[in-house]
Amino acid sequence: SLKERKLFVQMQIANLQNKEVNIIGAGLAGCESAYFLTQNGVKVNLYEMKKIKKTPAQKSELFGELVCSNSLKSTEPLSASGLLKLELEKLDCFLLKVAKNCAVPSGNSLSVDREKFSKIITNEIKNNKKEVVTK
């Protein structure tokens, strides 16, 4: 159940107090992890390679850059991606909130303004006063 999952996560977070967590990569997973951990009092070191070298698909130094498509797929609850969004919403997913804030019209899917999406993520992570260090 959701209640049991939240309790399990709280117990795991308690084990990380007074420790530092290193996260490699400021893509979607790295940013969500960094944000979640810092909101729960864990110090995070977030390492991103773009300052040194970008891949051919990467165009900016922003975090959470969507390189292939601006679509985060269906919002229909009977689809796998739609159901996942409902679950992420219940778990208070940082990136889902940002995505909804940056949404552009696209029918029954969640599509975002890619630049706005990445700028908000980058600003939230870099300006987080809860112990996130970007390198």
Model-derived features with residue positions:
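Extreme N-terminal leader/targeting segments of oxidoreductases
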Residues: 11-21
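N-terminal Rossmann-like FAD-binding beta1-loop-alpha1 element of flavoenzymes
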Residues: 21-42
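Conserved beta-strand positions in the Rossmann-like core of class I SAM-dependent methyltransferases
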Residues: 45
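N-terminal FAD cofactor-binding segment of flavoenzymes
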Residues: 36, 40, 48-96
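N-terminal amphipathic/basic-hydrophobic helices that include classical n-h-c signal peptides
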Residues: 1-10
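Fold-independent oxyanion-binding glycine-rich loops
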Residues: 26, 48-49, 135
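Feature captures the FAD/FMN-dependent oxidoreductase FAD-binding
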Residues: 90-135
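Conserved active-site and cofactor/substrate-binding residues in soluble primary-metabolism enzymes
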Residues: 28, 79, 83-86, 112, ...
